Amino acid sequence: MKTPGVMIAAVKSGSGKTTVTCAFLKQLLCRKKHPVSFKCGPDYIDPMFHEQVLKIPSKNLDTFFSDVSQIQALYEMELPGHDIAVLEGVMGLYDGLGGIREEGSSYHLARTLDVPIILVVDARGMGKSVIPLIAGFLQYDEKKLIKGVILNRTSKMFFDTIAPLIEEELAIKALGCIPNEKELTISSRHLGLILPEEMEELNFQLEKAGQLLEKYVDVDAMIGIAESALWEKGETVTEEVKLEEKEDLEEKAYSGKVTIFSRAIFRGKNKLYDTKNSGTNIIPPRIAVAKDEAFCFYYRDNLRMLEHYGAELVFFSPLHDEKLPENIHGLLLGGGYPELYAKQLEENESMRKSIKEALEQQLPSLAECGGFMYLHDTLTDREGTTYQMAGVIPAECQYMGKLVRFGYVEVQLPQGLTEKGTAERPEPEKIKAHEFHYFDSTANGEDCIATKPVTGRSWKCIHASDDHFWGFPHLYYPSDPKFVKWFLERTEKHI
């Protein structure tokens, strides 16, 4: 593909890469560019900044969740209609699984996609020591992907002094600096960053960040770095990928090794429900998806994968709607912040009743993290106030005052839930996931086993049966296409 791309990465978390990324995207829009953005890793909130505030399409790319060919397809399928791709890194550039592996790191993603890197360095309180710091990162860069540096939280006077030394000693472009201004600090939440709609001055902050980037950083040189990788390969820059290639990329991204399903309902190109090409009156399953202020954490590719297989998504609000949508065949309750809206969720008694009745009638359902919390009898917030929830799971969910689970896991599915291996030697099916929660349940479930990829530590989790799958892990569907097939096939009995 011939769309320019660049990654904004950092020496460590809290260096300002999100501010720089958003400011850069803002300046691209000012230049009448049509950017698309990506977030390295599993965090939901940075893509929400890009989409909701800057109105730029964004999604996650994660080299733990996906293999090399899948990552490339997931990246390339977003490029049509865009003339530059901006990737925001995660943590420090080389911080991957367990903090010790390259897999899952920003650098691993940049190397997989062969995109250049601009390194953001928090230079606050530093002098010439910033040079050996940068030098160490360059030494680790086997593929020579780091093409420029931005010094954050430092004065222009210092930058003008140190920049010639950086370029002379390290042979790398010093692109500019961003002054240390308090109003540019984006408040933290317990997962990534605060939700965009909850920040009164967010637009002001991003506007100011864009102005500072334009004033103190060579934005044209940043764009040039994105394009330089193409020039070095002798490729020409084009504005968009051919649209006809997109369907093949989706097939590669969402199908994995699953090419033919055993069910007779399979039609067409890997769709379970293809009403266009089947020649029959197949009714696609309608999946109700909770989406509002309380339930907003969804991997874009999870939803698109359901649609890719032919499902129709119907969005609704557990906060504001009175009941579930009509004529649905499945339910998806994603993560978010139900604890911040517990009072409103409790007060919407008709919705709680609607969901409980539907699940008691065995409506196929998936619930993760915040959605899982909502299904409990009660939820107790950090102030100790207890609220009534949907009452589907006879248990309590409460704030623990500390991080309960954090990081990547592989979830081993119950035997027989999906098929894998051979009859003689069945192999457990696994789906990759991520956890990050300060709440815990008195009944986390025992139907699956979650295992940490580096340490091998494992524990039981998830409530799973023939019609539901509920638990704390945030699942990444493309890592196991058969899981999606299993869920959609469960919806058939309700059509």
Regions found by a protein language model. Name each.
Residues 338-417:
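Cysteine-nucleophile active-site neighborhood
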Residues 285-340, 344, 357:
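Phosphate-binding active sites in nucleotide-utilizing proteins
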Residues 197-242, 265, 281-283, 291-295, ...:
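Acyltransferase
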Residues 282, 295-308, 312-314, 399, ...:
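C-terminal and late-domain segments of enzyme folds
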Residues 233-282, 417-428:
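Intrinsically disordered, low-complexity terminal tails and inter-domain linkers enriched
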Residues 127-242:
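Internal gly/pro-rich beta-alpha loop/helix module
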Residues 7, 86-88, 118, 150, ...:
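Structural motif
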Residues 2-19, 25-113, 121-148, 153-160:
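ATP-dependent carboxylate-amine ligase catalytic core
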